[in-house]
Amino acid sequence: MHTLTLTRPDDWHLHLRDGEALAAVAAYSAREFARAIVMPNLKPPVTTVVQAAAYRERILAALPPGGPAFEPLMTLYLTDNTPPAEIDRVAESGFVHALKLYPAGATTNSDAGVTSLSGCLPTLTRMAELGVPLLVHGEVTDPQIDVFDREAVFIDTVLQPLLAELPTLRVVMEHITTRQAAEFVLAAPDNIAATVTPQHMLMNRNALFTGGLRPHHYCLPVLKREEHRAAIARAVTSGSTRFFLGTDSAPHARHAKEAACGCAGIFSAHAALPLYAEAFEDAGALDRLEAFASFNGPDFYRLPRNTGTVTLKREEWTVPASLPYGNDTLVPLRAGETLRWQLAG
C-alpha cells in the first residue's frame, strides 16, 4: 500500500501551551487534525468557562492565516474548589467539552490538582447528570508506590471506587500505558473509553535508556515493559470502539528536557499520523487506523464525524533534529530518524 486516505482525524489529548510556545506549535496540529481536545494545565490553570473562552481565542489567533480549519475543543482543570454550577456553564457553553482530573503533583503543572475526589463528589455528580466527560490522568501520587505501578494502583484504588459511586459518569482514561488499563477499558461499559499516544504503542521503557539516558523519551505516565506496550497495541488495533487517538503531544524547550531535573513530555505533533500509521502497520491493522483516528473519538464525545480527508503516503523521510520553539528549540519524537509514512501534500 503506497497511499492511505482517512476521514480527517482529531486529536483527543493535546498540549498547546500559550504565548510564544503556542505560536510555535499550533500549526503542526492544525495540519493533521480538524479538532483537538486542549489540555488546561497552563500557569495558572484554566479552571472556568470564562478562562477557557479567552484561551480558545488565543489558540485561534495563533493559527497561521489561510491554513486548514482547526477547532480547539476546550477543557477545564478540575480542582478541589470547582463548583457544580461551573458544570452547568460547561454544558451550556458549546465549546468546553470536558473536565480534566490531575491528581495533585502527578505531572506537568498539576500542583493545583485534586487532593481528594470525595471533596469533588457534588461536582462529579453534576457531571454525571449532564453527561460531561471526566478526563483522567490515571496515576496515584503516593511516593511509596513504584512509579511503574501507579496507573494500575489508580484503577484499583481510585477509579473503580469512583465508578461504583457514579456508574454513569463518562470517563476517558488518558494516555493509558498498561495491560491492566487496556483490560479495564475492554471490560467496562460504554461510558468508559481511553486515549492512546504514539509513543505508548511504539516504545517500551528500554527506549529511555538505549545508549544512555534519553530525556526526550521521558513522559508521564512513563513508558512501561514490553508486555504492556504489546497489550496496548493489541487493544487499540482490536477493533474496539473504546480507544481513540490522543497524542498527548507536549512541547518543552530543549534545555528544560536536557536538565538535571528534566520535564516530562514528548512532542509528536510534527508527525502524529505517520507515527500511528507505523504502529498500525506493525500490527498488521492499517485498515483499523481510520476508526481509531477519525470515528471513535467523535462518537464518544457525541460530536459529528469530520467530512474532509487526509492522505498519507508510504515514503520515507527524516525527522528534523530540532524545531523552533520561541527563542529556543524543541526536540521532536524520532528526531534525526527515518519515518516510513508522511502526509501527502
UniProtKB/Swiss-Prot annotation:
UniProt cofactor(s): Zn(2+)
Residues engaged in binding Zn(2+) 1: H13, H15, K100, D248
E.C. number(s) listed in UniProt: 3.5.2.3
Group of enzyme by EC: hydrolase
UniProt xrefs under PROSITE patterns: DIHYDROOROTASE_1, DIHYDROOROTASE_2
GO molecular function, one term: dihydroorotase activity
Post-translational modification N6-carboxylysine, affected residues: K100
GO cellular component: cytoplasm
Keyword annotations of the record: Hydrolase, Metal-binding, Pyrimidine biosynthesis, Zinc
Catalytic residues in the record: D248
Catalytic reaction list: (S)-dihydroorotate + H2O = N-carbamoyl-L-aspartate + H(+)
Binding residues for substrate: H15, L16, R17, N41, H137, L220, H252, A264
Co-factor remark: Binds 2 Zn(2+) ions per subunit.
Residues involved in Zn(2+) 2 binding: K100, H137, H175
Family: Belongs to the metallo-dependent hydrolases superfamily. DHOase family. Class II DHOase subfamily.
Function recorded in the entry: Catalyzes the reversible cyclization of carbamoyl aspartate to dihydroorotate.
NCBIfam families: pyrC_dimer
Protein name stated in the entry: Dihydroorotase
